Amino acid sequence: ESVTKAICHCLDCQKRTASAFSVNVIAPREHFKVTQGKTKTWSYTSDSGKDYIVNFCGDCGSTLFGEPTRLPDVVSIKAGCLDNSGTNLGSMDAEVFVERRVDYLKPFEGMKQIVGMI
């Protein structure tokens, strides 16, 4: 199965990252596992009306990955927490929640522009 690399402009990602967007690797759940430690979770109702479960480090509080209950077969991994230069992902595939992009940013060239979630 494929992996999608997406920049998310939703308000929740902006707030959680204290930034204009978050960088995510959306991967099949069956190919994902936490290899060290134990995560803590909290959830909220997303724009889709479904719960979104946020998994974060219990020691430092960094967001690690999300579980959109609307899409139960995938996890949305925050690229900055990946080992082996996870933030150097090469080209990205899409921007999501483009309707919430902050005014001072332009669309990233060559990326699919998606209103709402994938």
What does each model-found stretch correspond to?
Residues 1-118:
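A short Gly-Trp-Pro
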